Amino acid sequence: MALKSPAFRKKFPLLVTGSLLAMQPLATQFVVAAEQYDCSVSASGAWNCAPKSNAAAVDLPPRPVHDTTSVSSNGTVTSQGTSSGEQSAGTQLVTEAKGKGLKSRSADYSHLDWVPREKLTAAQLAETGPYCSGAYVEPIRPGMDDKTPMKDAPMFVGAKASRYEQDAQVATLAGDVVMRQGSMQVQAQEAALHQAENRGELNGDVRLRDNGALIVGDKAELQLDTGEARVDNAEYVLHKSNIRGNALYAKRAENAIIRLKDGTYTTCEPNSNAWTLKGNNITLNPATGFGTATNVTLRVKDIPVLYTPYIYFPIDDRRQSGFLPPTIAAGGDNGFTLVTPYYFNLAPNYDATLYPRYMADRGLLMEGEFRYLTKGSEGQFGGAYLNDENDDRKQQSDYDKTRWMINWQHKGGLDTRWLTQVDYTDISDPYYFQDLETDQIGVKRTDFLNQQGSLTYRGDSFSAVLNAQAYKLATVANVTPYNRLPQLTLNGTLPYNPGGLKFDYQTEAVRFERDLRSGAFIDEDGNSETRLDNNISGLARANGDRLNLAPSVSLPMNWTYGFLTPKLKYVYTQYDLDLDSQGKNTLLAGEEYSSSQSRSVPIFSVDSGLYFDRNTNWFGKDYRQTLEPRLFYLYVPEKDQTDIPVFDTSESTFNYASLFRDNRFTGSDRIGDENKLSLGVTNRWIEDNGFERQRFSIGQALYFEDRKVQLPGVVFADRDDARSNVSPYALEYEYRFNRDWRFNSDFNWDPDSRSTRSGSAMFHYQPEDNPNKVVNLGYRYRNDQIRYDESTGRWVVGGGDYGTPGSPNYVKDYYKIQQHDFSVIWPIVPQWSLISRWQYDYNRERTIEAFGGFEYDNCCWKMRLVNRYWIDYDEFSQAAPQNEKGDRGIFLQIVLKGLGGVTGAKVDSFLDKGIQGYREREDQAF
C-alpha cells in the first residue's frame, strides 16, 4: 500500500511503497531495511513508524556498496573510487562503441529493450520488418499511460534499503531503486534525493523511461518537481520508431524533449553501425515527431561520407516543417543535379513544399506546391521557374529560355449537390517535360496538358455539368487538339415509370475550336519543315457549335433467371460550322461544306440474357458454376454523315464488351449504321466465400448489312471488316490460381482472314503475405487500329504505318503492336533480391526497355543497383520516330530507413512504371 505525505506534497510529491522507508522524520545514524517498520501518516502529516515485532528474527540485507558519489550519515558527500566528474574504472564510453550499442551493459542489448526475433510474439512480429533480427519492445510497467501533469503527479519510490538525514534533508536509496512520477520512471542502483532542491542524483545502471522513450546511462541528475533530467554516457531508444543512438550526455526537458550532446541517431539494430547521423547537438521532440541536428556527418560503418551544418528529420510518421531528404544525380543534359526540398507544415489542413533544384548545365529551378484541405474541398497550387542557361534548343521553334510551369488541381463541393473541379496545367514551351523533371504531386508528363474547370449539379434523377476544357501541347509531334469552350450537358431519367417504362435523356451543347498553327517549324539544327497543322485539310479544319439530343425509352424486365430490355433511342444533332479558306479548298472526296448541318438517327435495340447456375466440385473443391448467355440485337439505319466534321470522335476498339454497345464510335460526330445480332456467353466459377476462381467469355456478332458510315476519308468498300457478315470472335479469360496468382487474356480472331486481330495475355504473381515477390509475364498484339496520322492528315485503318511509302520519315508498321513484357522482383537469398525487366518489340526487332540489377534490404537501409537500357524520346523533329534513340545508364539508389532516400529517386520512378505490383510491394514494405 502506498502512503501519501502531505508535508512534502507541494515541493516533493512522494508516495512510499511497502518496501521502503523514505523521508524518515527522525535523524538516524544507521541504515535499516524498510521491511522492518510499520509506517503511517500522523495527524500532523509526519511519519509515524515503529519496528515490527519480529524484526529481530529477520536478517537485514547487506549494506549497499557505493561505487561513486554517496551521501554520508552526516550529510557530507563522499567519493569512493573516482571523482564525480570521471567514469568509474571499467565503464565503456559510448564514443568507443562506434555507432553500436554498448555490449558492456548487456551482451544481448536487453538494456535497450531489444528482444530477439525468436522471442517476439505474433503481434510483435507483424510490426517487425522481415529482415530485422529483433525489435525494441517497451515493457509493461505501472503508470506508463498516466497522463497526469508532472507538477500534479505524486511520486512513487521503491528500493531495497534507505536512510534519511533530516538535517540535510537528503534521502539515500540503494538497491534496485525505482522512482515513478506520472508517466516517467527512473531506475538506478542507488539514489540521493535532496528535498530542499527537489533534486535527485542517481548512480549505476540508470534507466529513464517516458512515453515510449528509454534513456540508459551510468549516472543521472533529476529535477523531481519538473521531470528534467540529465543522463551521462547515455544510450537512448524510441521504441515505436525503431530509433536508437547515444550521447556523451542526454537531457530530458520538462516537455519531454530529448537533447543529445555529441550524439548519434540511427534506425539500425544495436549490433550494427551501417549508418548513423552524428551531430554536436541533436534534439528529438516526441511531441512533434521530428528531430534536428547541427554540424552533422552521415557515417557509414563509422566512416564520414556526408556533412551538413543542419538537418531536420522525422522520428515518426507525423508532418512537420523542415528539410526533406535531398536528391543527388549526375549526367544527362542537366549535369550535376541537387534537389533540397523544404516542407512547410503550415496547418493541419494545408501545407507547402519548396523544391529548389540546382542543375549545373541549366541553373536553379525554383519549384513549389501548396496543398489545402477544407470541409468541402481539396486541392493544390504549384509553380516552377527557370532561367535556362542551356542553349541546345535556342534555334527550335516555340522554345523559350524563360521556362515556367503552373498547376492547379481542385475538387470541391459547395453542398451535397454542387460540385466543382479544376485540373489546369500550363507550361512555357512544348519541351518543358522533356528537359525538366517535376516533383509536384499529380503533375505527369503527357503530350496534352489538361486545362479544365467544371461545375456539376446533381439532382435526384439528373445531373447537369458546365465544363470548359482546353489542351496545351507538350509536344511538337502532334497536331493542335480541339478545345471545348464551353460545354453544357444535362443527363438524367424522368422520375415516373408508367407501365414500367424508363425514360432517359442525354443532352449536350458544346463549342469546339482550335487555332491551327501555320508557317514552318525549325528544328534544333536550324532546318525548316512544314508544321503538322498544315497537313489538316477539308472539314477537319472547321470550328463549330454542336447540339446533341438523345432521348430514349426502354422497358427493363428483370427476373432471377434473366433479363429482357427493349429500347428505342433517337439522336438529333445540329451543327453550326466555320471553315477557313484552306479547308474549303482542300475538301476530301465527297465532302461538301455547309455552315449548318443536322442529323437524325433512330436506334433500336433489344438486350437479353439468362442466368443458370449449379453446384459443382472441381479437384475436390466446391464451386458455384454459372452459365450466362446473352443476346443483343441492334438496328441503326444508315445516315450520310460525310459532311459532318469529326471533333471528338474515333472508332472503338473491338473487344467482347463492344458486341453489346449501341454505337461503334465514341463521341457524337458519328452514329454507326448497324443491323446485327450479337451472341455471347459467360461462364464463372465462384467459391462459397464469393471468390471468383475463373471467368470465360466468348461472343460474336452476325451482320445483316454492310457498315457504310465511316470516319472522314475512309471508304467502307476498302475495308473487309466493314463488309463481312460476321465479326471476329471475341474471347476473354481470367483465372486466379489463388489470391496471389492471376492470369488474364483477351483474344480476337477474324474467321474471314483466319488471322488474329488483337490479343493479349498477362500473368501476374504477388503473394498477399509476401509482396516482395513479383512476377509479370505478358504479350500484346494489335493490328486493327484506326487512328489519325499527323504526318498525312488522314485517318488510317490497320497497318499502323507512320507516313506514306516514299516519304522521308516513313516507318512501316510503326503503330503495330507486337510486344512481350517480362518483369520480376524475386528474393534469391535472404536480404538480396533480383530486379529485372525486358520489353521487346517484335515488329521493329528492338528492345524498348531492359534493366537488370539487384536490391539489398536490411533492417535499417536499402540499396538498389540497376543497369538500364531504354528508348529515350527527345523532340528535335516533328517526326516522332526520328526523336527516338537508345540510351543506357547505371542507376544507384540508397534509402536510409527512418531518414529517407540519399540518392536514386529516378530508380523508384522507372521501377514503378515498369513493374506491375512494385508500388504495392513498397507500400506494404516495412
From Swiss-Prot:
It is found in: Cell outer membrane. Residues 68-91 have a biased composition (Low complexity). Residues 1-22 form the signal peptide. Keywords: Cell outer membrane, Membrane, Signal. Pfam families: LptD, LptD_N. It comes from the Bacteria. Residues 55-91 are annotated as: Disordered. Disulfide bonds: none annotated. GO terms for biological process: Gram-negative-bacterium-type cell outer membrane assembly; lipopolysaccharide transport. GO terms for cellular component: cell outer membrane; transporter complex. InterPro entries: LipoPS_assembly_LptD, LptD, LptD_C, OstA-like_N. HAMAP family: LPS_assembly_LptD. Together with LptE, is involved in the assembly of lipopolysaccharide (LPS) at the surface of the outer membrane. Belongs to the LptD family. Component of the lipopolysaccharide transport and assembly complex. Interacts with LptE and LptA. This is LPS-assembly protein LptD. It comes from Pseudomonas syringae pv. syringae (strain B728a).
